[in-house]
Amino acid sequence: MGTSLGAACVLFMKKNLHYLVQRALTGFAAGVMVAAGVWSLLIPSMEQSAKMGRLRFVPAAVGFMLGVFFLLFLDRVIPHLHMNATEPEGAKSGFKRTTMLVLAVTLHNIPEGMAVGVVYAGWAADHHAISAAGALALSLGIAIQNFPEGAIISMPLRSEGMGKGKAFVYGVLSGVVEPVGAVLTILLAQFIIPVLPYLLSFAAGAMIYVVVEELIPEMSEKPHFNIGTIVFALGFVLMMILDVALG
């Protein structure tokens, strides 16, 4: 829903997306993702590990690194193109520039769907460390963060000459992987619970990878402005408040 609403901004767009607006949107998305990774995923992972009688840092550390390497692997094998970049990444292909731009966003939406699915799977299984309010906080935060993501993909496509309707559809499609990933994760809840601490930190590692590998470089491009950093902090604080207030 958040991605679709953000993508809908292109329908009212009359000119190119200003680079400061793009940096602000990117910074906000990055801030929400970092806060969600810490407050909604890593900390619950360590809390559950302690209640299971394990060293609380082991599942968090192992799962986090596995999440990072998983996204690194996908980055290497899936052809994609980051915003404002000229050279594509991943395996060589004959894909068009617009297709690879959408693939980049779709690829990096995978951990967000996983995060929501893992948390709801834990709640659905009546896991003691995950409340309905906590799962709602993460879902709401991801939905808010998806709004700028939808705008970030659809509006630049429009700036490159794509029709408004087509740019909107591409923006919506980039977020389809999230609900699909979340539903699949929930359906596998009975298999997930025994390794829930690892999966929570896995999703956190994948999300932090996206922030460091894609979002921070995009919000820090020349010419230098601090707008991305400031809005990053606002996004982080908003997600932190949501998690603490609802969780």
Language model: regions and residue ranges:
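Intrinsically disordered, metal-sensing/regulatory segments
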Residues: 1-247
